[in-house]
Amino acid sequence: NALRYFRSGGQQMNGWRYMASPDDAEENWYYFKDGRAYSTSYKTTEACGYGIAKIKGETYCFDKKGRMRTGLVELSDGRKFYFDSDGKMKTGRIVVNDDNHDNEVFYFTTSGSIGKRGDGFTGVKDGSLYENGRLVSAEEGMKYEKVTVDGKTYVVNESGKVKTSGTVTDADGVKYKITKDPNGGY
C-alpha cells in the first residue's frame, strides 16, 4: 500500500516531489527514497500515527500516506509539534499564526531523540508557564490568575510570566501570597 514513484525511464525517484497521489486529488509534498515515499511505516520514527524523519539536517513529519505535514500537528497521545510552511520542525519559543491558533505563543523542546525533540513543553521555561507547548496566561483583563498545570499551582500574569514571590491581587480583588510549595508550584 506504499506510494511509489518512478521517473519516465523507469528510475526510482529519490528526493522531494510535489504531486497528487493516486488516491488523493489534492497535491502534497512527498519525500522518496528508492522510489518509495517516506511515511509512518517507512524510513521514519513512528510517533503515534505519524512518521518523523531527519532529512539533510532538518526534521519533517509524514502521515500514513506519505504526505508531508505542516503547521501544528497533534499526535494521538496529545503531544504537539510544529512544522513551518516548508515542513521543517520548529523548536524553542515560537508564535503560531494559523487559522486555529492565531498569534499564540508555544514552546517546543530543543533537545531529545527524534520523536521526542520538538514536542510541546510542560512547565516553567525562562519564567513563563507552558502546558503541552502552549503559553498559559491570565485571562485578558485579569492582572493575575491562579492556574494548575501538571498538578502544580501557579499564579501567572497576562503575558504568562509566573509570579514567584510577594503578594498579588487579581481582578476580583483576591489576594495571593506567593511562596514556593513542596510540589514545585508557587
Which residues fall in each region the model found?
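Extracellular adhesion/carbohydrate-binding repeat motifs centered on closely spaced tryptophans
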Residues: N1-Y186
